[in-house]
Amino acid sequence: MSEMNPLLLLDNGSMMSVLNEGEFRCKNLTFEEAKHILEIHDEADILRCFNSQDIENVIFNYLGVEKRNFTYKHIRNMRVGQDAIVFKLYITPSETQPIIHADDGVEAKKIQNVYVYCQYLTRLA
């Protein structure tokens, strides 16, 4: 792993933790840009700073990134010059609650909508 500045993968909570000190630049990423950034980094040069299976599903199943086992590490401060991809989940109650019936008769109801977007974060100073 690059001892200087591994790429950090953050979620809503871990992003708030690393923003406690310094100057940062943040920009929105398309899913294609996020996938490209992940693919150009070696597995050993990426740290996963969250424990969310939902976000891992976004990375590997939705973005289509090859399954890798990124090392987990709790990070409190980003280093100057360090970059991160932030996966922001936004959950809202469902305005409609359609009911579906499975083949075996089980009933399920939609209760929420889940949205995700990506940001690229760099610590400047």
What do these predicted regions represent?
Residues N77-A125:
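Polybasic, proline/glycine-rich intrinsically disordered low-complexity segments
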Residues S2-A44:
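N-terminal low-complexity, intrinsically disordered segments
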Residues E23-F31, E39, R48, S52, ...:
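Intrinsic-disorder-associated interaction segments
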Residues A44-T96:
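Acidic, low-complexity, intrinsically disordered interaction modules
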